[in-house]
Amino acid sequence: MRIWAWILLLSVCCSYLSPSLGEEAEIPQELIERLAHSEIRSISDLQRLLDIDSVGGGEDASAANIRSQKHDFHHNRLVPEKRSVPSRRKRSVEEAVPAICKTRTVIYEIPRSQIDPTSANFLIWPPCVEVKRCTGCCNTSSVKCQPSRIHHRSVKVAKVEYVRKKPKLKEVLVRLEEHLECTCTANSNSDYREEETGFFTSPALVLTGRTRETGKKQKRKKLKPT
């Protein structure tokens, strides 16, 4: 009889625990897309977007207060009165502030290939400058912080060479790319609007400073019969 009683008890416990199994499921793609294209600046915004009543990870303040009052009441009845010891205050934990997608000042190191790709015996001054670039993170990894409007400006830098045992200085123009506006777009979408021309430009062509000529076909040389 005892064995059957234990089996019955285990079956009842399993019936209560079984609904909790399998609660964790894969996040729907629809939810990921909604998070990616929504403006979220705080945990409260995320809570409202997900339509969640409460945030997990902490105890309800009212329940904690009632429990502490009951504990103090029983403690005062059983334990004799002692000197009051100053209690340490709990450190308040601040909410994380997202690094939103926007333009920020970054340090751009001028590449030597942009000054003179044929030589290596020279110095650049200044070696780096400040530019505005799109930085920050988006709500999900499916989108990326990218520039939607850019601007180009030229600056003068000094190229120092050592010719015939004497330093030689030459001013060289360097074209810098600056970002004016940013947006969270898909990683595959890397085109943006240029402020000066109004055309869509590929970032790879802007960084190298080289443009491809289109509409010209190379003529093949005809071989003369021997």
UniProtKB/Swiss-Prot annotation:
Localization of this protein: Secreted
Key words, A-Z: Cleavage on pair of basic residues, Developmental protein, Disulfide bond, Glycoprotein, Growth factor, Mitogen, Secreted, Signal
Sugar-modified residues: 139
Signal peptide positions (record): 1-22
Residue span(s) of the pro-peptide: 23-91
Gene Ontology cellular component list: extracellular space; membrane
Cysteine-cysteine disulfides: 101-145, 134-182, 138-184
InterPro entries: Cystine-knot_cytokine (IPR029034), PD_growth_factor_CS (IPR023581), PDGF/VEGF_dom (IPR000072), PDGF_N (IPR006782)
Domain remark in the UniProt entry: The long form contains a basic insert which acts as a cell retention signal.
Family: Belongs to the PDGF/VEGF growth factor family.
Function summary: Growth factor that plays an essential role in the regulation of embryonic development, cell proliferation, cell migration, survival and chemotaxis. Potent mitogen for cells of mesenchymal origin. Signaling is modulated by the formation of heterodimers with PDGFB.
Protein name as it appears in the record: Platelet-derived growth factor subunit A
Organism: Xenopus laevis
Lineage: Eukaryota, Metazoa, Chordata, Craniata, Vertebrata
